[in-house]
Regions:
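A beta-strand signature from Gram-negative outer-membrane beta-barrel systems
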Residues: 206, 218-265, 302, 322, ...
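Gram-negative outer-membrane beta-barrel transporters
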Residues: 794-797, 802, 807-809, 813-921
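Periplasmic N-terminal accessory/gating domains of Gram-negative outer-membrane beta-barrel systems
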Residues: 93, 103-108, 122-186, 190-193, ...
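Short loop/turn motifs that connect adjacent beta-strands in outer-membrane beta-barrel proteins
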Residues: 253-260, 299-307, 367, 453-458, ...
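Periplasm-facing N-terminal accessory domains of Gram-negative outer-membrane beta-barrel systems
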Residues: 29-128
């Protein structure tokens, strides 16, 4: 296997020793003499929240600090005497106060900040304003490039999905599923499997089987305070995110002034009767959602307000219903092109979710804090149903030349295709469900922080698991087929709902003419496992020099375990008559077109994962036995990452005091071990499989278990610099390295022999990640009240794309050659790393609250961001390709919001835009290119606060019922069209 470590294990051990030396030096140096200290909390007087990132300074001494996540600050090294302390925070009035202290004394001093806008009765709604200010403050104070949004910055979230906030950040494209729900993220052109999603810095587990995509449809925004998009990676954080890392940040339970706080939300989500919905959705229009939050601060074990606890309960039911159609056309860029494959679907899904999140922060001493977080999420789907009809010319597809004998009749137009009633003219009717999906996510995170003089230590231990059971449950997948029937598809009057007319042959509206296909009844029963165990220890030491500079070192360790299992089964029909159909089932297609294609319910023929009538079904027992082997995959990935870095400013005052830097290097050693079965060189015959299915499966797979491993070590340096030209103008420049790991499926055992070419294709457990060298530059301008303007440019040079079919050696001889003695002398073909590409772009962002405007306009605020990307390179191939030739690369995205507040009333309009992009690339023929059309999603939100404990809300999701659309080759050839529907969420929330 290819294995090209950049750093030897011996070199890695030396770096561990260096980390230990640095931490040891810090501990010994931390025992210096006592110094005067001013400490305390900074809060927002109106909201009673303690403020993170507030600046506390003594200007005469050029001494300053920022408050932490609990609103606490520490000014150390303060000489005896009286000093003026200045406290400032974006959107609030600065406060100056004289504070006196004796030599070596520790003085507590709290500050409550406010602003005139909070004192005006017509502006009662302050949560959103504070959220914007907190996000801008965190961004301004950040040492690296990141975008930050508060979860309350965009009003009420109709689904309370934290991902709905993330897609409003510059450079993110939200990937939607068939029901219109957010499934994943593309960041700066990098697809979801190449980006990391974290919670408080710890990796989240996914739902993608052997992939690396992290779906967020089970992560509620009620758990978090902010969403961060990290684009400039630093050595003390993971670099395994090619486009950017999305981090969901929870709130400390110590971060409030009150003794106790209770919040709640109750909403109902309805598919209104005046909007277009599929019939099965109309029967289940309304579903509910509720959250309850509890937060309290205690005086524990002799301390004062030193224990904070919070508990968040979340329960929701969500229903989706969508009609969509999928088509395929003749392989030509000219018009007309015949339509040879026409499908339409009704999809309904009912999701239930229950979350419990508990968090505690305990400050043992003024310099030591321990924390705990536990998350319990159950996400279930027990009524997913999909009805599919496919009319196609089997065996005569896009390259068919119509003639007197083909399925496609010559003389077709761009809107009308005629199909002959021949054997290759087929209609399949498939019903899937009701499917089951059970996702059980558990997370435990324990951490500590400790300060002693110039030394700060912190660490965490985390465990996260996602266990998924997915399949058909008591249902199944059933496909009934009719052959030798003809039809005419006429899209003249409606492309979405065309006429589908009979053209001879068997009557496709008569259920008696349909029979199940071979293996046409199946029951899926899969398990997916994703477990992440992490540990980290970080030490930071403030250097004894005049400039505020510190050194930081640490080591992070993470183990991921990913596995898939299956007990799926399938049956063939042995009966002679048609199966009973459901004459009462009404689909969207039948309602809109009147065509009466019969439908069947798969669950009628299953009972407790067995066929209801064994006398008319024959199971494929060989498939059942081999599935135990062919679907079993297990991968364990272990990452050990020490790092060293320095951070600070060039001086305390003047130009040097306004110039900061951060730089260092992170080393990551990755070790992979994978386990699974592969096929024997010679498989049993069909007759043997029928006569002895279990024995045949054993002979074909049981003796071919493979345990393979690989490793690599890489260094990831980064350098970041920033300068404050004025109090409001800031620039940043950074160079960083990052990477995207290969999917776990690329690491697991797989062998495909080719007897003709005497070659065997295998997977590569030592496959290297795709790497990127990143340049970022930004110009940022901040203005009061609560606003900023940012212009950014970035450039990524990406290397080591994953390429298959690369010769990587020759199989040796002997029984220990790794292939049970088989394939001696054969060529080994595997995946390897090759190719380069460049991705670059511009990002523009502007937001402001217009409280300086007169009269009612004072309540306006707005936000807009726009990202434009470009790319070129060979992407691991042999030819140069550009932006329009890279599948999944989204060149343009934008977001906008406009809100208005007056007294207790607020209104908000949200717009999310994604430009057209290539979804699938056909290098051999541009007519096979698949394009996703531009998409503009509009949400409208209204609320009225009767009192702090009661606010009424009304939100419209997908106001214009924007569809998801794709086309094949040319825009007139619609390949996919999906109306996810419009929903209205109404309810109330409050705080006590």
């Amino acid at each position: 296997m290819p294995n090209q470590p950049v750093i030897t294990p011996r070199g890695l051990r030396s770096r561990f020793s260096l980390v230990a030396v640095v931490l040891g030096f810090g501990i010994s140096a931390a025992s210096g003499a006592d110094a005067g200290v001013i400490t305390g909390n900074v809060s927002n007087a109106a909201t009673r929240n303690l403020l993170s990132g507030a600046r506390v300074e003594i200007p005469s001494l050029a001494l300053g600090a920022l408050t932490d996540d609990t609103g606490r600050y520490v000014l150390a090294g303060v000489p005896a005497g009286s000093h003026e302390v200045l406290v400032s925070y974006i959107g609030l009035d600065s406060v100056r106060r004289q504070v006196s202290l004796a030599a070596g004394q520790r003085v507590a001093q709290d500050f409550d900040l406010t602003t005139g806008i909070y004192k005006m009765d017509q502006f009662k709604v302050v949560g959103e304003r504070e959220g914007d200010a907190a996000a801008i403050t965190a961004y301004r104070n950040s040492e690296n490039l990141k975008n930050i949004a508060a979860t309350d910055s965009f009003g009420n979230l109709p689904n309370l999905n934290a991902g709905e906030v993330a897609i409003r950040l510059p450079g993110i494209y939200g990937e939607l599923d068939a029901g219109g729900n957010l499934a994943g993220f593309t960041v700066r052109g990098m697809t979801s499997g190449l980006n990391s999603v974290t919670m408080d810095g710890g990796l989240m587990t996914g739902q993608g089987g052997m992939g690396r995509s992290i779906f967020v449809n089970n992560i509620t925004g009620a758990m978090f305070e902010q969403v961060e998009l990290v684009k400039g990676h630093t050595p003390d954080k993971g670099a395994d995110s090619l486009g950017g890392t999305i981090n969901f940040k929870s709130r400390s339970p110590l971060s409030m002034r009150e003794k106790r706080r209770i919040t709640y939300t109750v909403t109902g989500r309805i598919a209104p009767s005046f909007t277009q919905q599929i019939p099965i959705r109309e029967d289940r229009r309304l579903h509910g959602l509720a959250t309850l939050g509890y937060q309290e601060v205690f005086d524990a074990f002799g301390g004062s307000r030193n224990l904070g606890v919070s508990l968040t309960l979340f329960n929701s039911e969500t229903a989706i219903g969508s009609f969509f159609t999928t088509r395929d056309y003749q392989n030509t860029m000219t018009s007309p092109a015949f339509l040879w494959d026409y499908r339409w679907d009704d999809l309904y899904n009912h999701r239930r979710q229950k979350n419990i999140t508990a968090k505690a922060d305990y400050r043992l001493t003024p310099s030591t804090k321990v924390s705990f977080l536990g998350t319990y999420i159950d996400h279930s789907e027990v009524f997913r149903r999909q009805y599919n009809v496919r009319a196609f010319t089997n065996g005569q597809a896009q390259d068919t030349v119509p003639s007197a004998t083909t399925s496609i009749v010559p003389g077709y137009t761009s809107r009308i295709t005629t199909v002959r009633p021949v054997a290759s003219s087929v209609i399949d009717v498939t019903m899937t469900g009701p499917n089951n999906f059970f996702n059980r996510l558990r997370r435990v995170d324990a951490g500590f922080e400790h300060e002693k003089g110039p030394l700060q230590l912190e660490g965490n231990l985390r465990y996260t698991q996602t266990h998924i059971n997915i399949g058909n449950g008591e249902g199944a997948v059933l496909t009934n087929r009719i052959t030798g029937t003809g039809w005419i598809i006429d899209r003249t009057e409606s492309d979405l709902y065309p006429k589908f007319l009979a053209n001879g042959g068997l009557d496709f509206t008569n259920p008696a003419n349909y029979r199940p296909t071979a293996n046409g009844l199946s029951n899926q029963n899969d398990q997916q496992i994703h477990e992440v165990t992490e540990g980290r220890l970080d030490g930071r030491y403030t250097l004894p020099i005049s400039a505020p500079v510190f050194a930081k070192a640490g080591v992070h360790w993470r183990e991921q375990h990913v596995g898939v299992r299956s007990a799926s089964r399938r049956w063939s029909y042995t009966g002679t008559t048609a199966l009973p159909h459901d004459p009462n089932l009404l689909t969207m297609d039948r309602r809109m077109t009147g065509r009466a294609i019969p439908q069947w319910e798969a669950s009628w023929f299953m009972k407790s994962r067995e066929v209801a009538d064994p006398s008319i079904w024959r199971e494929d027992l060989y498939f059942r036995e081999t599935t135990k082997y062919t679907t079993y995959r297990d991968v364990v990935e272990t990452v050990t990452a020490p790092y060293l870095m320095g951070q600070g400013k060039l001086g305390r005052e003047g130009w040097a005091g306004r110039t900061g830097f951060l730089g260092g290097v992170r080393w990551e050693k990755t070790e992979n071990e994978a386990d699974g079965w592969v096929r024997a060189r010679v498989l049993s015959t069909a007759a043997q499989q029928t006569a002895d299915p279990a024995g045949s499966a054993t002979r074909d797979y049981a003796n071919n278990r493979r345990v393979i491993d690989g490793d690599y070590t890489k260094a990831f340096p980064s350098v970041h610099a920033w300068h404050d030209w004025t109090a409001n103008l800031k620039t940043r420049l950074s160079w960083s390295t990052s990477f995207g790991r290969p999917a776990f499926g690329n690491l697991s055992p797989a062998e495909t022999p080719n007897e003709t070419q005497r070659a065997i294709t295998i997977n590569n457990p030592a496959l290297l990640p795709q790497t990127a060298k990143n340049w970022d530059a930004t110009l940022e301008y901040y203005f009061e009240p609560v606003g900023n303007l940012t212009v950014g440019w970035f450039h990524k040079e990406i290397r080591d794309y994953i390429v298959s079919g690369i010769e990587s050696g020759t199989v040796g001889t002997g029984s220990d050659n790794g292939y049970n003695g088989e394939y001696a002398g054969w060529t080994i073909l595997s995946t390897a790393n090759a190719g380069t590409a460049v991705v670059q772009g511009w990002e523009f962002s502007y937001q402001q609250q217009f409280t300086f405007l007169p009269g009612l306009l004072k309540g306006l605020s707005g936000m807009i961001n726009y990202t434009v990307l470009d790319t070129h390179g060979n992407y691991g191939g042999t030819t140069r390709r550009g932006s329009g030739q890279i599948a999944g690369f989204v060149p343009r995205t934008a977001n906008a919001s406009l809100s208005w507040r007056y007294r207790g009333f607020s209104a908000r309009l949200l717009v999310n835009y994604a430009g057209e992009f290539l979804q699938s690339y056909g290098a051999a023929s541009p007519a096979r290119n698949l394009y996703r059309m531009e998409r503009t999603l509009i949400n409208l939100g209204l609320s009225y606060q009767l009192r702090p404990s009661l606010t009424l809300t009304l939100d419209v999701d997908n106001l214009s019922n924007e569809p998801q659309r794709r086309y094949r080759g040319v825009i007139e050839n619609m390949e996919y069209f999906n109306y996810p529907g419009t929903t209205i969420t109404f309810g109330f929330n409050g705080r006590f």
